[in-house]
């Protein structure tokens, strides 16, 4: 059996902290305004995984009203979300993350981002794709006010998929 989940997140720039994207500190003059570390990519990916497993959403698992998640490392949130997904009997088939940002440029960090996600999801890097695009200077991302991210996750229940082979 397979399941597909979609996640979306957005954060505005404006806080004096590192800019974390896919668990990587991307050099930039500002960080995100957020309750946690604001990693839009890992939040979108966590939401995609949680949604695919029908476990609700990231706000249900990690509410921003709970002080234990204040300045939380989003890698830890992703790992915990995936632990809960695995408890349902599913594993990652593949994930695809799209970062939507006018700046900073993501290209130099994409391989590192893929590796971080593969490590956190305990899967082969070939199961992880990260890409970046702009909105051609349109909207809030185009004006450089923040970053948006979408993610899709395919989950597989290995016991029910005889053709599945964890690479």
Curated annotation (Swiss-Prot):
Assigned EC number: 4.6.1.12
Keyword presence, Nucleus: no
Keywords: Isoprene biosynthesis, Lyase, Metal-binding
GO BP terms: isopentenyl diphosphate biosynthetic process, methylerythritol 4-phosphate pathway; terpenoid biosynthetic process
Pathway field: Isoprenoid biosynthesis; isopentenyl diphosphate biosynthesis via DXP pathway; isopentenyl diphosphate from 1-deoxy-D-xylulose 5-phosphate: step 4/6
Cofactor: record remark: Binds 1 divalent metal cation per subunit.
Annotated site, Transition state stabilizer, chain positions: 35, 134
Ranges in coiled-coil conformation: none
UniProt cross-references to Gene3D superfamilies, sorted A to Z: 2-C-methyl-D-erythritol 2,4-cyclodiphosphate synthase (3.30.1330.50)
One Pfam entry name: YgbB
Listed InterPro entries: MECDP_synthase, MECDP_synthase_CS, MECDP_synthase_sf
Gene Ontology molecular function: 2-C-methyl-D-erythritol 2,4-cyclodiphosphate synthase activity; metal ion binding
Required co-factors: a divalent metal cation
Record's catalysed reaction(s): 4-CDP-2-C-methyl-D-erythritol 2-phosphate = 2-C-methyl-D-erythritol 2,4-cyclic diphosphate + CMP
Quaternary structure (record): Homotrimer.
Function: Involved in the biosynthesis of isopentenyl diphosphate (IPP) and dimethylallyl diphosphate (DMAPP), two major building blocks of isoprenoid compounds. Catalyzes the conversion of 4-diphosphocytidyl-2-C-methyl-D-erythritol 2-phosphate (CDP-ME2P) to 2-C-methyl-D-erythritol 2,4-cyclodiphosphate (ME-CPP) with a corresponding release of cytidine 5-monophosphate (CMP).
Family classification: Belongs to the IspF family.
Name the record gives this protein: 2-C-methyl-D-erythritol 2,4-cyclodiphosphate synthase
């Amino acid at each position: 059996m397979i399941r597909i989940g979609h996640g979306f997140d957005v954060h505005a720039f404006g806080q004096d902290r590192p800019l974390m994207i896919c668990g990587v500190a991307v050099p930039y003059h500002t960080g995100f305004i957020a309750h946690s570390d604001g990693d839009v990519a890992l939040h979108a990916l966590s939401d995609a995984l949680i949604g695919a497993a029908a476990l609700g959403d990231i706000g249900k698992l990690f509410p921003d009203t709970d002080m234990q998640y204040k300045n939380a490392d989003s890698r830890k949130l992703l790992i915990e979300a995936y632990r809960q997904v695995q408890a349902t009997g599913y594993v990652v088939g593949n994930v695809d993350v799209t970062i939507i940002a006018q700046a900073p440029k993501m290209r130099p960090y994409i391989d590192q981002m893929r590796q971080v996600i593969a490590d956190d999801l305990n899967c082969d890097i070939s199961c992880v794709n990260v890409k970046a695009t702009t909105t051609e200077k349109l909207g809030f991302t185009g004006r450089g006010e923040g970053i948006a991210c979408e993610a899709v996750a395919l989950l597989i229940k290995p016991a029910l998929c005889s053709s599945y082979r964890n690479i």
